Design a protein with these regions (language model features):
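Short, aromatic/His-centered strand-loop micro-motif at the edge of beta-sheets
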Residues: 187-212
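Extracellular carbohydrate-recognition regions
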Residues: 1-64, 80-93
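Short strand-turn-strand beta-turns centered on an Asx-Gly dipeptide
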Residues: 224-229
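Short, exposed beta-strand/loop patches in secreted or surface proteins that constitute
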Residues: 60, 64-71, 171-175, 213-214, ...
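Short tryptophan-centered beta-strand motifs in secreted/extracellular beta-sheet-rich domains
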Residues: 49, 142-144, 206-223
Length: 264
C-alpha cells in the first residue's frame, strides 16, 4: 500500500508542476492521499497466523494461560474459568463439622477467605497472555484482524517498556451487540488510567473484526474498528521506544488471524 501511495504522490506532484489538472482537483487528490500516507514505513511484525506457523524471528512467548496456532483459524485462546466447589460441599465433611463451622466469626472469616481465593482463581483460570520482544518506535501503526467467537470476555493488545506488564499503552476491546467497548489505557508509574473510552459499540460475536491503531510522533492516536474511526485522542506520556508487544485475553474465545505492526 505504501508503494502505491508513494507512486500517487509522485504523479500528483508531476501533474501539479505541469498544470495538467485543475488546482482544486489536485488539492482534493492530496487530501485523499494524506489519509493513507503515514510516517510508519518500517515493518516490525507481519504475521499471518492462519497458516499455522509463527513468522521467523517473531519470538512470541506465552506468559500465562494458553495460546494455540490453528491452521485456518489463527492464534487461538479459549481458556475458560473453572468453577470452584461450593464451600461445605465436600462429602468428607460431617454434619457436626459443618454445624461447628457455622458458629461465630471463625466461619465468617473462612467464608470471606474462600470467596476471595475463588475469585482470584477464576481470574487466573480464564486469563491468557502472550508477548514478543520487539523494538517498536514511539510512533507506530498496529493492524489486527480478530476472530471473535462470542460476546464474552475481552481482548487486549499493547506496547510496553521493560516487561509485558510494564509501562506503555493498551487497547482493550470488548465485543457486544450494541454494548461493546474500546478502551485506551496508559500504564505508568502511578498505575493504570483510562485515556479515552468508547462504549455502546456494535461488535457482534461469531464475526471477524479489524482493529487499527496509530500513534504519530507527537502523540496523536487514532483507533478504528472495521474501517470506522472510533477514537481520536492524544497522550505524550512516553517519548522513548517500546521494547515489546503484548496480547492479553480475559474470558471468551478469540483468535488473532493477522497482525501487522509498523514503525518509523
Amino acid at each position: 500500500l505504501q508503494n502505491m501511495v508513494d507512486e500517487l504522490n509522485r504523479l500528483i506532484d508531476d501533474a501539479d508542476k505541469a498544470r495538467a489538472a485543475d488546482r482544486q482537483f489536485i488539492e482534493d487528490l492530496r487530501g485523499v492521499d494524506n489519509q493513507y500516507d503515514g510516517p510508519w514505513r518500517k515493518t516490525i511484525v507481519d504475521e499471518d497466523f492462519t497458516d499455522g506457523y509463527m513468522a521467523k524471528k517473531s519470538s512470541w512467548q506465552t506468559i500465562a494461560g494458553d495460546f494455540q496456532l490453528r491452521r485456518g483459524l489463527g492464534l487461538y485462546s479459549d481458556v475458560q474459568a473453572r468453577q470452584q466447589p461450593a464451600p461445605g460441599s465436600s462429602s468428607q465433611t460431617s454434619s457436626e463439622e459443618a454445624a461447628a463451622l457455622l458458629i461465630g466469626a471463625i466461619f465468617d472469616q473462612a467464608m470471606k477467605k474462600d470467596k476471595k481465593e475463588t475469585a482470584t482463581s477464576r481470574q487466573h483460570d480464564d486469563y491468557a497472555s502472550i508477548a514478543s520482544k520487539k523494538t517498536v518506535s514511539n510512533a507506530f501503526a498496529i493492524d489486527m484482524t480478530l476472530d471473535v467467537s462470542s460476546l464474552e470476555g475481552q481482548f487486549e493488545i499493547g506496547v510496553y517498556q521493560g516487561n509485558p506488564n510494564g509501562n506503555g499503552y493498551r487497547l482493550v476491546f470488548q465485543p457486544g451487540a450494541g454494548n461493546g467497548s474500546i478502551e485506551l489505557l496508559r500504564l505508568g508509574s502511578r498505575g493504570k488510567s483510562i485515556i479515552d473510552l468508547r462504549d455502546k459499540l456494535s461488535a457482534k460475536g461469531d464475526q471477524i473484526h479489524r482493529l487499527q491503531w496509530t500513534r504519530t510522533k507527537v502523540g496523536n492516536m487514532s483507533i478504528s474498528l472495521n474501517g470506522k474511526t472510533i477514537l481520536q485522542t492524544a497522550d505524550r506520556s512516553f517519548k522513548d521506544k517500546y521494547t515489546g508487544i503484548v496480547m492479553n485475553k480475559q474470558g471468551g474465545a478469540f483468535a488473532v488471524k493477522q497482525l501487522t505492526v509498523q514503525g518509523t
